[in-house]
């Protein structure tokens, strides 16, 4: 795990290219175990929609994350789920309010790349 938050330089645009013809998406990345916010898509999401770092959204909207995070996974019966929940350091959250439509598809690419061995606990919360 990257508990000490070692800086592992990775430019996802250098290691990933989508070759699906005629595909237009809002492209986002998770690099190793963190949401990549250094270069976000220029497309705008509808008002009220939240897409981004689970860690940052938990700071900005704690009531939203608290209401949904870890509610479906039973950590008392599954050790792997409990471990992942306990040690997840970031992830992605996608929140779409009722009656709101996101027109452009969102593409989320997870990239694992490092010069050292470490473990990654990923979290994706879709509401």
Task: State the predicted function of each range.
Residues 1-127:
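Glycine-rich and polybasic anion-binding loops at the starts of cofactor/ligand-binding domains
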């Amino acid at each position: 795990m990257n508990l000490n938050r070692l800086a592992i330089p990775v430019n996802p645009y250098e290691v990933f290219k989508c070759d699906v013809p005629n595909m237009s998406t809002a492209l986002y990345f998770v690099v190793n175990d963190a949401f990549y916010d250094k270069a976000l898509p220029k497309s705008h999401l509808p008002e009220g929609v939240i897409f981004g770092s689970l860690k940052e959204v938990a700071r900005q909207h704690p009531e939203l994350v608290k209401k949904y995070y870890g509610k479906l996974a039973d950590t008392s019966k599954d050790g792997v789920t409990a471990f992942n929940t306990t040690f997840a350091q970031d992830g992605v959250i996608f929140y779409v309010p009722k009656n709101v439509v996101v027109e452009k598809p969102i593409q989320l690419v997870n990239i694992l790349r490092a010069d050292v061995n470490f473990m990654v606990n990923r979290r994706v919360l879709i509401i």
